[in-house]
Amino acid sequence: KINEIKEVAQSNNLFLIEDSAEALGASVNGKKVGSTADSSIFSFCGNKVLTTGEGGAIVTNDKAIFEKIKLIRSHGRMDNVRYFENTEQSKYLELGYNWRMSSITAALGISQISKLDKIIKMRQDNAEYISKSLSKFPEIITPSSDGDSEHIYQMYTIRLSSKEIRDKLHNF
């Protein structure tokens, strides 16, 4: 659906932000999630495929958006100025916040990037095993892919064929 959404956004001159918080490494039609919109957002919270314990990232291939994001995340100041050494350039260009990731948190995330494909493969293998094990229960509907997408199984969510079965399982 992201391509349809992008067409609507473009035809109406709208800025498109893709919520990719739980999809790092997933793909649709051979294209990585997070690469279609003007900007995309990924989460690195504790239960994500790649975790830093907290925080996340915004990605874009638009230089103007990139520069704006840098201002917002750094108190509205340019990040190439040494503010404590040069009082002449201590201007706040606009409203901003302290949304910079700490170096130790970033290092934790960077250390996992080389393992990302392996982590995703492990999740996919685990999901396949669980789905196969649950296949003998027709009332349990396991996750599936439409063939054009690669699921990373951020979560493994089942559906049940009826409310009554759901209630019984819930009360078990």
Residue spans for each PLM region:
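Short beta-strand-to-turn element immediately C-terminal to the catalytic PLP-Schiff-base lysine
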Residues: F42-S43, G56-N61, I110
